[in-house]
């Protein structure tokens, strides 16, 4: 449990921003990381919820998270404590809410919610990839840099963001495109993210556009780098086609259309793939995606000529108005192929009567789209000649544009022949003119300029004379011409400028200066000709002005609409036209935007008004037109120019424009729609800081105007004075509604502390004392609420401005704090106000020292605030403020220390959030540190008890940091032991689970401090135990009735009855502390690095050991004494090796056996677990000393166990153990009468054998002989299993270590093992023994011992024989051929003896198993021999089995024959064709045995079996030799006569295998002739067996044996008439087999008839 806690705490420590001695920082989007670290989570939560609900109005799906991520219970969530499943669930919800928040990223409400998700759920860590990708479309937004600053990406593709994260800075689009094109994994990751977003129905336009744009740029980058087009198609096509077909997200689908268009333009698409794509797009058309879809289809069809739409596609396109949309879209996109294919398909698909309507529609369409000559010809070809050709007037333009170039080259297209003559062409123009003139003739005074402008566009396309006819409809054409210039196309503007010039020239006595601002508008046109015509018009105007300096009429002056216009004098007009414009005609002609910088530059002047009359006049003139012109475009242009006009002329400009601003402020929402946002912003930007009051007066008007004014005030704030800033801030915060741009402008405006002080002072929070007044106040409570609201907004504003930079506001804020606390019950939002105030004061007081303490700053106010509220956030912030005050002015908080700590122990310590812990830490560090600095005495043990008492309530993962902080503050060298002692006191009454928790925590706590502190705590705890024992003894000896005593380490008196239990708990903690991980290592490190430090630590350790030993001498309680010894052992383990040996050497000679045993255990553990323990060899004599007649059995065993461990560890120094082996193998060890001591001695000798090796030889004989005698006795003892096991183990090690010297003990060891019933049971020590003997003992010596043990097997039985044969098998496996070659004769002789078991009647009950095992092992032996070596042995075996006993023991020879043929069968089956020829040696004997009627039936059966194996494994035609076949065949077939006594299957198989291996017609005939005789045998069994053999022969040999059929037919016919049912059934089966082999064309019946 402790290790788990440590791991958890380490994890929290690594992730916690509140690290000791480190500036706290917290990831944040809205605040500086330092400020965010001290912010209250509750406050962030409240802010997030408010923003969340505002967002939910626009995105209702967010309400799902109202009870999860934004629920009240989320404040208590700590992801570190959640399990994997719970964290994965939160991750999934975080991803979902991120996708919903992404479209609102630029809104502050979304940032508030994100701030909460970052601070509470760490989305920047847990779902970092989704966090970054969700807001990647806003990569150039300033807040995206904060997104990166918070993020900790985990995926490799996002590691390219590392530099941007470190800075942090925003990303350029080029950076992202570069990363996408460079890293294909990032490309796939981002594409999948976009797809997932679409599938979750969270796609939004910014993401779709960003994805499409970046993908197109990546496509261009890859294409330009000569990537294989097919590879690029593979990367893009699947994702793009998915987007195109995804109808659930229009934005995603439109982005797919854009990408597909790019792919079609960049990569070669197969013509076969375009029709399916077009079909897929048209199937998914909607009113939302129709235009992008048509553009995409158009791009696809540019690469697929002669495409035809089917009927369904045409119907769908028509339903969306594709005809008119194609015309509209063709103005910006090339859609000629689409247009032609669409119209051709449309005309072909319609009936005759519909085609006329379509052609008429085409008439109005084709004139507005450009097609090539070939396309025009193809389009005309689908129209029948007999159609109404006059309806195709629109083709005139096409024919002119397409055919004319070919005429110049002398190439006339066939399309010309479709035109009848020029006369018809001219009729088309007349027709068009007539239609348009008719429309123009219908114009009246009610016709709008916009409609007339449309006619003007048509007239410009047909003929300029028609345009003149249109102008004639106006009595005064000047207004319409000006309207055309301001709103028409380039062609209309040019015609209008021409006509305007004519009008001026015709009316030379009229001053047309009213046209100058409109002409100025045309000078910024992108069209060069327009700008040239405009300059010519100005030149003409100037020339006429020069001719006639005095005009009788100024055009427009009498018009009431122009009453507010300013007019230019002749001189001013000349200045405007010549100096201002014509002087820079070349620049203006080249660049239309030149006006915006040049005119303001020329109008700028610092002259006095009387010397700048022309500049002022022109400025007034332009300003009046900017305010009063009826042409919106002209107004906007003039305002944008005037925005840049500065100097002395600004007063004139603002004087004229101010009424326009007032007019706009009075517009209602409907009327305001007639004014563009661009015009409003341009108008407001014309005002500077001198008009601040005027601008401020319009702040509460229309939202567009108000927003523009706010933005302008931010821009001019550097020129504002403090009163103006105060006035502006007051105006903003006093508004009932607070739109989002108010927040932005207040964030951007700089507010000095004097302004804040006046703002705070302007709010009066005073409760009326007069009841009548108070009653009226309640009736009119909104006044009081308004003050609270303004105060809240002021404080929120101050919070965003970094309150630490306003230290002078601390005093007024404390006064406000006092007022809020006093009126807490009367203010609804008092908690929120208190949090704001406390947080601001904490930042201010913590930022700078307090030189003079204001009377308003009182600690009792804060203490009362802390104790009077249940709100944890207020309590935490108040404590932080107390901490800051303690640091800045410690004397101010001195008298409030104990109430604060009492409060903390009962409430704050139980909270489980980072902010509360931060509060506690700050309070402890600052308050206690301040008291220490003041030198005040206070009861630190009482302070410690506050925290110890609160231990169960403190969250587990928060405890370590808190207690470390307390101890570091008050002094860990003194009070670490006090904490441990007080925890020990708490364990007395705690539950077992709580005791374990305290144990684990104490261990973790102690490990976190230095080695010196740990040793000091052990020393002080030991001294406490000894002191308490002495106090207890003194109270008992005095005889006084004392039940309680006072100890300095505890804040309360201790009951004498529990004092002993308390010491036991303290001793447990001492042991626990001493066993802490790496304690000894840390000590050794200090010893290496600092000798002086180690001397002090060593002294402390000696002191602790001395105290514990003294305690063990004085204590009389056995349980307490046991804990003393445990603690003593733990402390001793901390000693370095040299000191360890000194101390333990004394303890090993102590008179107390218990203490010696403890010392032996300590030594053993140190040797096993320690490092660099060579110095411990000095203790070998001391350990050996404990193996003596004076020691009890337990001590002797422990000493030998310890000696064994030391022998293993110090095996490199065997000379040290020569003396101990003599003691161990002597009367106190091996020869001890106690069985347990013997076992320990044997185990110790086993280990010493490995260490000493040959050095043990002087003692070997004595040890082994005595051990074998012990082994023999143990075998007979029912409880001697452990001793038996130990002896065998020791012998195994002897055989391993000294194989040459221990060979003489192999035979008795084998005999003992074979005789043991337990050796081969569960532990299998016997098998291990035999494996060791087989592996290590030389073959020659081993075989000798085995042969000598064989007679013992005859006595012990078959089980022993089988185990010995297994040992031989192991020996044969581990022996080389050469080793076997030296003893093979003796081995063969042994096997002959073992093979004779059947004759000698050994193992009668299990002789078959023994014989089989012997044969198998013998075959292993044979495999080790060469053929040359084995053949003589085989002949010897043959003569031994079949000849040696022929005369001396006729009955015994049968047993050997039985063995021999059993062996021969296994031998042939094992070695197969390699040894088939060995049968030549036994063929005659085999024939003789088979021929003899006296042969044993079992032998006869085994002989037949051997023949089967011999026949089956013949691959060299051994049995084809006539001499062998002639011998064996008759004898083998004669065995049929022994049918009842034989295994029929073996005989049948032998005869069939012989026929198969000796296949020839002569052999078949010979065998068949002999077999046929038995078909007529009087013995039914013989006849049946012969029939079975014939059946098997026909079945096995088939057609080969059919050759004997004619010879067999008479016999078969007789058999078919046999009276015996069995014979008849067998014959029927034979006939069936013969018929099967004869086939369909023949039958046995043919031979029988």
Swiss-Prot record:
SMART domains: BP28CT (SM01036). It is found in: Nucleus, Nucleolus. Its main location: nucleus. HEAT repeats lie at residues 1608-1646. Pfam families: BP28CT, HEAT_HEATR1, U3snoRNP10. GO terms for molecular function: snoRNA binding. One of its GO terms (biological process) is positive regulation of transcription by RNA polymerase I. Keywords: Nucleus, Ribonucleoprotein, Ribosome biogenesis, rRNA processing, Transcription. GO terms for cellular component: 90S preribosome; preribosome, small subunit precursor; small-subunit processome; t-UTP complex. Signal peptide: none annotated. InterPro entries: ARM-like, ARM-type_fold, BP28_C_dom, HEAT_type_2, HEAT_Utp10/HEAT1, U3snoRNP10_N, UTP10. Involved in nucleolar processing of pre-18S ribosomal RNA. Required for optimal pre-ribosomal RNA transcription by RNA polymerase I together with a subset of U3 proteins required for transcription (t-UTPs). Involved in ribosome biosynthesis. Component of the ribosomal small subunit (SSU) processome. Belongs to the HEATR1/UTP10 family. This is U3 small nucleolar RNA-associated protein 10. The gene is utp10.
